[in-house]
Swiss-Prot record:
Domain ABC transmembrane type-2: 33-259
Pfam families: ABC2_membrane
UniProt-listed PANTHER family: NODULATION PROTEIN J
The protein, known as: Nodulation protein J
GO molecular function: ABC-type transporter activity
Lineage: Bacteria, Pseudomonadati, Pseudomonadota, Alphaproteobacteria, Hyphomicrobiales
Similarity annotation: Belongs to the ABC-2 integral membrane protein family. Lipooligosaccharide exporter (TC 3.A.1.102) subfamily.
Gene that specifies this protein: nodJ
Role noted for this protein: Part of the ABC transporter complex NodIJ involved in the export of the nodulation factors (Nod factors), the bacterial signal molecules that induce symbiosis and subsequent nodulation induction. Nod factors are LCO (lipo-chitin oligosaccharide), a modified beta-1,4-linked N-acetylglucosamine oligosaccharide. This subunit encodes the transporter.
PROSITE patterns in the cross-refs: ABC_TM2 (PS51012)
Source organism of this protein record: Sinorhizobium fredii (strain NBRC 101917 / NGR234)
Topology of this chain in the membrane: Multi-pass membrane protein
Assembly mode: The complex is composed of two ATP-binding proteins (NodI) and two transmembrane proteins (NodJ).
């Protein structure tokens, strides 16, 4: 059994680049529309909640509410971009377009393909998160140096959510099933991770639950950087995101092996 599983793992450290490049070549034809689409929801939330609700809320943790919200929207934009790329575009390449089927006829293994797809989703998340942060910095809700410090965190956040979404992609019979992942996992996590309001406002049980959510760890790294504040538990948050990035990858490869190669 181990030999069968090992045979579908990445063949070498660079094969995935071919998959990434193929996706990039297809994406760049509609790059502007893709970027605007990924920015629409977080930017709308930033302006709608930040200025509308912010006028009533005032300050949160000593800062204007819109500045507090901006960091949450940066992490959220990375989450949304990586997730939707994986559960929709990747699923289409695997199921409807049969792009994976063609790729498996080459020297690429299933692991190479999955790793390339995750790297591409993380790249789109990095682009979306960076664009959102530039909007926040332009409006004065983030320091410009923080953009550079937050880039690795945004990329890692994208990879982590892409890995989690790949499990859903491996299990879902069709597109209709993705709505369960969005409504039962992503939406509750948005409100439990400190993106919209401080986690300290939640009941104790939900505060403890937030420590298990990848979005919470991402926000705990991005918000202090954007606000030029010292952050605590940096190693813990990075380690948690790495676990969410790596473990689901291996699990999804095993699930996809059963689905495609059995």
């Amino acid at each position: 059994m181990w030999k069968r599983y090992a045979a579908v793992l990445p063949a070498n450290p660079w094969n995935w680049i071919a998959v990434w490049r193929r996706n990039y070549m297809a994406w760049k034809k509609a790059a502007i529309a893709s970027i605007l689409g990924n920015l629409a929801e977080p930017v709308t939330s930033l302006f709608g909640l930040g200025f509308g609700l912010g006028a009533m809320v005032g300050r949160v943790d000593g800062i204007p509410y819109v500045a507090f919200l901006a960091a949450g929207m940066v992490a959220t934009s990375a989450m949304i971009s990586a997730t939707f790329e994986t559960i929709h575009a990747t699923f289409a390449r695997m199921q409807a377009k049969r792009t994976w089927e063609s790729a498996l006829c080459t020297q690429l293994t299933l692991g190479d393909i999955v790793l390339g797809e995750l790297a591409w989703a993380a790249s789109k998340a990095l682009l979306a998160g960076t664009a959102m942060m530039l909007v926040a910095a332009t409006m004065g809700f983030a320091s410009w140096p923080s953009v550079l410090f937050a880039l690795p965190v945004i990329a890692l956040t994208g990879f982590a959510f892409a890995s989690l979404a790949m499990i859903v992609t491996a299990l879902a019979p069709g597109y209709d099933y993705f709505i369960f992942y969005q409504t039962l996992f992503l939406t509750p996590m948005l409100f439990l991770s400190g993106a919209v309001f401080p986690v300290s406002q939640l009941p104790d049980i939900f505060q403890k639950l937030s420590h298990l959510l990848p979005l919470a760890h991402s926000i705990e790294l991005i918000r202090p950087a954007m606000l030029d504040r010292p952050g605590g538990g940096v190693a813990l948050h990075i380690s948690a995101l790495c676990i969410f990035a790596v473990m689901p990858f291996f699990l999804s490869v095993g699930l996809l092996q059963r689905r495609l190669l059995s």
